[in-house]
């Protein structure tokens, strides 16, 4: 069983909230028009207003998977393999708690779209690029990691060698597993 197939099976376990995908549209041939919106029950650009329109073909997008059927599995596996997406999982809700809403997860990731350089100049932060996220996470301190992970249990992506890479927060430290 491949690492992706094993991960997909885990996502289907009872009590698991629907996973999300962070998609870096900058690498999608044909731009935003070619994004696989039909596998998501909610899907939005992480930029808003004029910026979302102006940069729609290179912007980050967040989608919550509508199902874990074969079509969604194939699309997610393809996005991961082409280094265009990061699979985001949430922890199972405790007791009668509900998992965070799409709006809450969307707001959480929007917080990281802009960072400030050494001279206070705002800069776009492409944290959603699967080719760099692990290296970015490795330089964050404990508080920054706690803030970044927020409601997220795991980030799953394909490494440079194609192997699945899982990132999580464990005791305030980044844990990376291949």
Residue map of PLM features:
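Terminal low-complexity "docking" segments
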Residues: 1-126, 130-178
């Amino acid at each position: 069983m491949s690492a992706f197939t094993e991960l997909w099976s885990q996502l289907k376990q009872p009590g698991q909230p629907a996973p999300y995908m962070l998609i870096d549209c900058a690498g999608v041939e044909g731009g935003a028009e070619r994004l696989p919106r039909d596998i998501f029950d909610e899907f939005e650009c992480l930029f808003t207003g004029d910026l979302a329109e102006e940069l729609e073909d290179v912007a980050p997008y967040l989608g919550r998977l509508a199902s874990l059927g074969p079509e969604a599995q194939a699309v997610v596996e393809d996005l991961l393999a082409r280094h265009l997406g990061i699979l985001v999982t949430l922890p199972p809700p405790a007791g009668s708690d509900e998992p965070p809403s799409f709006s809450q997860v969307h707001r959480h990731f929007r917080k990281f779209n802009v960072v400030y350089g050494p001279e206070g100049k705002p800069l776009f932060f492409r944290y959603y690029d699967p080719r760099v996220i692990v290296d970015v996470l490795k330089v964050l301190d404990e508080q920054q990691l706690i803030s970044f992970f927020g409601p997220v249990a795991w980030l799953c992506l394909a490494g440079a060698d194609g192997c699945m890479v899982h990132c999580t927060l464990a005791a305030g430290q980044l844990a990376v597993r291949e």
